[in-house]
Amino acid sequence: MKYNYSRGENKVAIIYGETFASVLKKRPVTTESIVVLANQRYYDLFSEKINYAFGEQLGLNWYICRNDVHCNDLSELESVLRFLADWPENQDVLLIGLGNEGVLQLTAFLHQVSKCSSECWLMPVSVQALRQGLLPSVTIQQAQHATMHIENHSEEILFDSTLTNKKGAAPLIDLLVFIRAGLVCDYTYLQMLYQTYPDKKRLNQTSFNGILDELLSLYEQAGEKVDQFGRVFEAAFATT
C-alpha cells in the first residue's frame, strides 16, 4: 500500500504492506552509489536480505552506527561526513536509513547537509521509528539534548514488516504509539485498539499493517501535538 503523506509543504511517499524486495522490482534504483546507514544490530540481522534485494547493484555501501536510539549526535554526524568525504560532489547518492529513531534522524539530517546526497529513503524497524519519520523536522543531539534542527525532506518511507523487531517488549512499545495518537486525537480509535489487541497473544499475532492507514492520517493532522504528549513528564522524570 502507498500513502501520500504531507509534512506541511513537504510530501513523502509511505509504502507498507509489501517487502523491500518487491518495491525494488517495481522501481529499480538508478543512482550511481547507495549508502545504507544502519544500527549494528539491524545490519547483523538484515544486511544479507538488503544486499540480496539490490542484487548486482554496484556501489552499495554500509555505514554502521551504534545501537543507541540517541546515535543521532554530533560525533556520529562528523564520522559519517568523513565517511562520505571521498564521494565526488557531482555523483548521485541514494541515502537509506535502516534502523531505530536515531538512525532515521541522522540519515534525514545528512540528506540535507551532505554535498553529494540526491535522494533519501527511511526504513524504520518499528512503528516507534516510523513515528519519527512522520515528523516535519529532525535533530542532531549533544549529551541527549537537541542542538541542531533541520526540516525532514526524506522522499520515501518503506515500512517492511519482515524487517521489524518483533521480540520481547517491541510490539507493546509500538502499540503505545497508536495509543498516544488515540488519546490526543480520537477516542473511538482507542476503542478499536482495545478490540483489536485485547491481550498479549493477539498483540503478538496481529500485524499493525491493518491500522497504519488511520495512524498516518492522525499524524498528518496533528503529528507534532501527538509527539509532544507526555514529553513534559518524561523530561521531569529524567531530571529527578
Where are these regions (language model features)?
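Buried hydrophobic packing segments
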Residues: 80, 107-111, 178, 236-240
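Hydrophobic, well-ordered secondary-structure scaffolds
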Residues: 77-83, 100, 112-113, 128-132
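Glycine-rich beta-strand-to-loop/alpha-helix junction loops that act as flexible
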Residues: 66-68, 98-100, 234-237
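A short, small-residue-rich loop immediately preceding and capping a beta-strand
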Residues: 88-110, 114-125
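A glycine/threonine-rich phosphate-anchoring loop and its flanking beta-alpha core
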Residues: 112-201
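Active-site segments that bind and position negatively charged phosphate/pyrophosphate groups
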Residues: 200-240
